[in-house]
Amino acid sequence: MTHTNEHDHKAEQQQNGRGDTTTETVNPQKMKLVTKLLIDNKFGLMDDLNFSIPLTASSEGVPISAKTSELGTEYLKNQQENSVSPILPISRSTRIKADRVRIYLDYYYNILERCISIDSSQNHHEGVEGVYNPLQVIRNRKLKKKHHELPTREFYTTKHPIIAIKQFSKKPNKKMPWFVDINEKYMDLTWRTSHWEELVDPQGKLWFQSYSPSNESSGSSSSRRHHGHHIHPRRHLQHHSRVRTANSVHSNTQSLTPKRVMTNEEDNNNHNNNNMITKIATTPEAQISRNKKSDLNLSHIHLEVPITNTVTNTSSDQGSLIIEAKGSSYGGDRRGSSNTSGSGGKRNSKHYRSKSAGPPENEKSRMNGLEKIISKTSKGWSRSPKKNTPGLEKQVLLNPTISNGGTSRRSSNNGESISTNSSKSSMGITFGNTETYKTPVDNGKDAIIRQSLLSEVPVHTLRGKTSNRSLRAEGEQALESDKELPNGAGSIYEGAPREKTTSQGSEPVGLVSDSLQVDEQLQRYWHDTRYIMSTVAMMQHRRETHDIVKRREIARRNEIEITQDADTNIRKTADALTQYDNELNKVLKLGNDWTSKLLNDYSIRVETLISSSDRILSDINTTLTLKLKMFQENTERYVTVKVMRAQKMTKTIYRLLEFGIVLVLWTIWFLFSVLRSIRFTIFLVLKIIKALLW
């Protein structure tokens, strides 16, 4: 007994567990909702097909069908309460019209909502913005008519719905109707943004006397204002273009204007009898005038030396450079040197003059005329970057100074000797004691042909204390190497001349050649070597300064200013990170739970729901197909009944015709039989009379 009871108890627990699982997996409310949706779809389909179930009314007013009459009225009442209310039969055209009106009203209320729902911060026009006022639209309509601003043409792809105020008014086509349409409302919103100063209030006064801050660029009322509104932007554009042009001219002026030449105090003290060296500031007009000269006259290169050298580069057909150095020397000694070249045997002379002496008169007058012409068109040249580029390339001021080392042979200046490089990085301005530097290739002409071997190396000026120091060190090394040469041979460093020609009076003196012989090939090799060494030193110094600046910038960026307690910040950060990790673990756990539920529980529920919905849909499809077949059978039966009724009618007619014919024949037979009987009776009476008479 106990064993059987335990077995029954286990079976009940299993059944309860199954029931719990079924209740957990299936939600009756969702099933009801799905069933209602399917039934609604069914009735909608039946309504579209104009198919209805024939029902018979009971005594209590409850419709009873033939199949469900056996269940009773109570069941039918409950079913009627829980069932969906029947849909009224509405035609398709009525639904289309109702949908059109609904879309119209939704659009209208959407526009009204956009007009009214404006934040107070954006509402700059109180009384007009953020207010639904169709009377204001009608007043704006009058203003449009006053200024002949006709409304835009309206296009309708479909018929607009019937508006009652237009449809049932006495005059539907008024010029000024008291009705605001959607299109008019929308156009009024656009129109009033440029006519705020013309809007009129109900008293006939202007709403806004002047422009509001948000509408400075809006239009105005009259045609004059409209015209000005279209013209002012061009004036502003012209003004801005002039400002930009001025800025570009100013920037070009700054770019074209080189730095001033730095003079030497020792040079001023030592050269008391000579003219003072003035500071040169090249203007853009003079720069452009020098750039616009003929191809034979290139720009001058100003050298920062106590004896200022003006180098004039004259390009020949073969591309050679004829170099003249002009300046003033110190003291009354006048010494010139000249030497003949190896092949040509001609003399290359160098003339020195002071910079304060200025150019010749004819050249000065030509420069003034060109400057007057160029000053008129300087704006057009300043705007073009291509026209300003050659000027920047042709004139470069170099200011690295090199210490002299105390030798009197260098120059009269005891302080520094300046090295010069051209903007093209080497134009070959190297001078010997007796002649200008020439390349190993010589064609025997008077001009010195300089190949582009050294011009391939780019050399840029380094301005600064560090560059000056490095160049001074290079200069000292050059002086030490110069001391080893004979007294007659002059030392050259990067093309800096060191000859003395004229005195204060600039009197011409015959050139005196040195008594000592100089190896020209060795001197050229030495010049090339010193030039390349100086170039490499300058480039190395530039790389070192660039590395120093880069390291400083990286160190400045990597500096972190800690203004608070670092330990407290670290502790707070650690606490925040731990809290974040805990919250993240909670969220991950919750997400894992949900994923497991979705994969395990809800997947089963979804499968059961899908299977039940498929079953219900299949039942609905079968019922619909059966009903459709019944409908088809009924229609066919109706056709056959009509045919059968037609056959019965003809049969009755034929029978009536037959009966009539038989009746006529029987009447004829009856008549003949009556006549025959009458005849027989007459003959019988005659015979009886005859017999009696006899």
From Swiss-Prot:
The modification Phosphoserine is found at residues 85, 481, 491. Residues 13-26, 244-257, 276-287, 418-437 have a biased composition (Polar residues). The gene is MTC4. Residues 1-26, 211-287, 325-437, 465-511 are annotated as: Disordered. Residues 211-222, 403-417 have a biased composition (Low complexity). The chain crosses the membrane at residues 655-675. The modification Phosphotyrosine is found at residue 493. The keyword Membrane applies. PANTHER family: MAINTENANCE OF TELOMERE CAPPING PROTEIN 4. The modification Phosphothreonine is found at residue 263. The keyword Transmembrane helix applies. It is found in: Membrane; Cytoplasm. This is Maintenance of telomere capping protein 4. GO terms for cellular component: cytoplasm; lipid droplet; membrane; peroxisome.
